[in-house]
Amino acid sequence: EIVTMGEGENTEEKIGDDKINSTYMWITQDKKYLTIEFQYYGTHSEDKKHFLNLVINNKEAEPAADDANDEYIDLEFRHNDEGDTADRLGEGYISFKLDKIQDQMKGKKGLRIRVKTLYNGEKFYEVKFPSSN
């Protein structure tokens, strides 16, 4: 499920912004899920749980004037390593339901997702919605 920064307990500290790589992203044909293949560093201990979130970040005081004309919906893929040691590289998959942004999808080409990568800092990935047949 997509979470909104600042809503309820969804604070910057809880959601985190630790480094993570996205190696592949895709949206299901029915546009209901975004799946992300990812890499991260950790100890891979059962005692250390990492948290992953897909975030709507409304921290900007005023949206840019051209936001209404933007062809992509902006989201952030966030990682909280909960203080785990960056011991070895691991990988996995996670899927997020897109129902919270379903109304915003009309007329858009896809999603623009911000990721704080392991090696290259902040990157933005554009993932297009599948074409309807």
Name each model feature, range by range:
Residues 78-112, 116-118:
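Short, solvent-exposed, Trp/other aromatic-anchored flexible loops in extracytoplasmic proteins
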Residues 4, 72-76, 95, 112-114, ...:
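Ser/Thr- (and often Asn-) enriched beta-sheet segments in non-cytosolic proteins
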Residues 1-39:
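Surface-exposed beta-loop interaction hotspot
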Residues 119-133:
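Short beta-strand elements
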Residues 23-80:
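Short helix-loop boundary/capping segments
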